[in-house]
């Protein structure tokens, strides 16, 4: 494991399309390995096996994306280092609940991260500056294909990709954009958009909590399971 250095977020240091409103675009994939229990039901040996399997695939992930990756074992980090990763939204607080055999794989520009053994065996997250879902989507699918070339992924012909949380069942995909919306907050119009968003299959939430801090909001899809 490399020595910890504070990750520099490439999507924050460059300007993308519609950057005056759209700060970043994100795609996340949830995946699990076949015939292994979800992390919340797995024992120490299961979690250690999953961690080692994914570490071995880093060269394949690098080849698929053209990026250089490092990995961090969460239980080997100091409390401060762990909090830096949380504050930069590179890991979830839940990953710290029981850090043993938990892993973060991240590209050197931090545009791609993979949490290992959080809710699911794999949480692949890809970011891009501005309004650009195509770039992170292509990276996420490339990583997904690279992993599936070596490991069997939990998949059901009717239900799709199997996930720990039913809300991710199906595609396991969440696409979101990070928006700066001060005018809607000041004119008190945001609540109207929030109220109709479920009708569009979308969810809107404040990026920093409940008090509209920074007037920054995340909009993502609610539906991951297909229907006829």
What are the residue ranges of the model-derived segments?
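Long, Pro/Ser/Thr-rich low-complexity/intrinsically disordered regulatory tracts in eukaryotic proteins
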Residues: 1-158, 173, 187, 191-194, ...
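Conserved phosphate/anionic-ligand binding catalytic regions in large, soluble enzymes, centered on
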Residues: 160-177
């Amino acid at each position: 494991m490399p020595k910890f250095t504070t990750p520099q977020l490439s999507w924050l240091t460059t300007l993308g399309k519609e950057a005056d409103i759209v700060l970043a675009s994100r795609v996340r994939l949830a995946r699990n390995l076949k015939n292994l229990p979800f992390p919340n039901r797995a024992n120490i040996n299961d979690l250690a096996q999953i961690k080692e399997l994914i570490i071995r695939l880093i060269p394949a992930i690098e080849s698929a994306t053209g990026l250089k990756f490092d990995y961090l074992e969460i239980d080997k980090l100091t409390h401060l280092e762990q909090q830096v990763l949380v504050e930069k939204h590179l890991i979830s607080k839940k990953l710290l609940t029981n850090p043993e055999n938990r892993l973060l794989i991240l590209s050197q520009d931090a545009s791609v991260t993979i949490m290992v053994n959080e809710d699911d065996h794999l949480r692949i997250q890809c970011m891009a500056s501005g309004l650009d879902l195509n770039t992170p989507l292509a990276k996420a699918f490339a990583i997904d294909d690279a992993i599936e070339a070596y490991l069997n992924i939990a998949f059901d012909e009717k239900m799709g990709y199997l996930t720990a949380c039913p809300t991710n069942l199906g595609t396991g995909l969440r696409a979101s954009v990070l928006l700066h919306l001060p005018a809607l907050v000041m004119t008190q119009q945001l609540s109207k958009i929030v109220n109709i968003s479920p009708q569009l299959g979308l969810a809107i939430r404040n990026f920093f909590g409940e008090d509209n801090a920074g007037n920054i909001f995340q909009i993502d899809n609610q539906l991951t399971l297909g229907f006829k």
